[in-house]
C-alpha cells in the first residue's frame, strides 16, 4: 500500500514554496484531502430527451491550509451512450461528471487511502449518490430471492440511468471516504464556476482539448501534479 503521508508531505512542501491557491470554503476539508468540483450540462432539461451535453470536473488538493488547483477535464456527451437510458439530460450529465472525476482519481496510487470531497450544485446527483443508491442496493438484496429488481422509484418505475449510477457507486467504494457537498450554483465558488463553464463549452462542441488547456490562474498555466514514488519528487506538466 502506498504511503500517502509521503505524498501529502511532499505536496505541502512543494506548494509552500510555489503555486497560487484558493482559500478553502468548507472547514471539514482536511489536509491532504482531494476536492472534486463537478458540473453537467445538457441541451434538453431534466424531463426532456436530450440531444447532447457536456460534463466537467475540476480537481483541487488541500495542502498547507490552501486549496490548490490540480487539473480540469471536460467532455462532450453523446446521447447514444449505453450509460444514458433516455439520452443526455441534465441529471445524467451531472452524475457523469462525478463518474468521470472519480474515474480519474481512482488511477492515483493513493486512491484507496484518499478522502474525496465532491462538490456539486445538483441536488439530484448529491441525493442519489449519497443516499438513494444505498436504499436501492438494500432493496435489491432483499429482492434477489424473488428475482425482482430493487432499483425502482417510489412510483414503481425503474430508476433512470441505473447503469451509470451503479458504476459511479462502484467507483466511490475504491476510496477511503467520499463526502458529498451540495453547493449553490453561480454563488461565487470559483471552481464550481469553472466546471460550469467547461461543461457548457463541451456541450456546445467548442472544446478542442478535453484537458482545458486555456485555464490559467495568476498568469500561470494549468499544471497536472504527478508524484514519482521511486524518487519521491513532484513533477508538474503544463498544458
What is the predicted role of each segment?
Residues 193-201:
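Short, surface-exposed amphipathic charged segments that create phosphate/polyanion-binding patches used
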Residues 206-239:
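Flexible, low-complexity interdomain linkers flanking nucleic-acid-processing modules
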Residues 140-151, 200-217:
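Acidic, His- and aromatic-enriched active-site or binding-groove loops in soluble protein domains
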Amino acid at each position: 500500500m502506498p504511503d500517502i503521508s509521503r505524498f501529502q508531505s511532499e505536496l505541502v512542501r512543494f506548494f509552500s514554496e510555489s503555486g497560487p491557491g484558493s482559500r478553502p470554503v468548507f472547514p471539514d476539508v482536511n489536509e491532504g484531502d482531494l476536492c472534486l468540483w463537478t458540473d453537467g450540462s445538457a441541451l434538453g432539461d431534466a424531463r426532456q430527451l436530450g440531444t447532447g451535453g457536456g460534463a466537467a470536473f475540476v480537481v483541487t488538493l488541500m495542502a498547507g491550509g490552501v486549496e490548490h488547483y490540480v487539473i480540469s477535464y471536460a467532455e462532450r456527451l453523446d446521447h447514444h451512450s449505453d450509460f444514458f437510458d433516455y439520452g443526455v439530460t441534465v441529471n445524467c450529465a451531472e452524475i457523469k461528471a462525478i463518474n468521470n472525476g472519480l474515474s480519474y482519481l481512482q488511477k492515483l496510487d493513493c486512491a484507496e487511502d484518499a478522502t474525496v470531497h465532491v462538490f456539486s450544485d445538483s441536488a439530484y446527483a448529491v441525493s442519489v449518490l449519497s443516499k438513494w443508491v444505498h436504499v436501492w442496493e438494500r432493496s435489491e438484496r432483499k429482492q434477489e430471492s424473488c428475482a425482482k429488481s430493487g432499483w425502482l422509484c417510489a412510483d414503481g418505475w425503474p430508476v433512470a440511468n441505473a447503469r451509470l449510477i451503479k458504476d459511479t457507486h462502484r467507483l466511490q467504494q475504491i476510496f477511503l471516504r467520499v463526502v458529498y457537498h451540495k453547493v449553490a450554483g453561480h454563488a461565487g465558488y470559483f471552481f464550481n464556476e469553472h466546471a460550469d463553464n467547461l461543461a457548457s463549452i463541451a456541450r456546445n462542441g467548442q472544446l478542442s482539448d478535453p484537458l482545458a488547456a486555456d485555464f490559467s490562474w495568476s498568469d500561470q498555466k494549468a499544471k497536472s501534479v504527478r508524484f514519482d514514488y521511486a524518487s519521491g519528487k513532484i513533477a508538474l506538466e503544463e498544458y
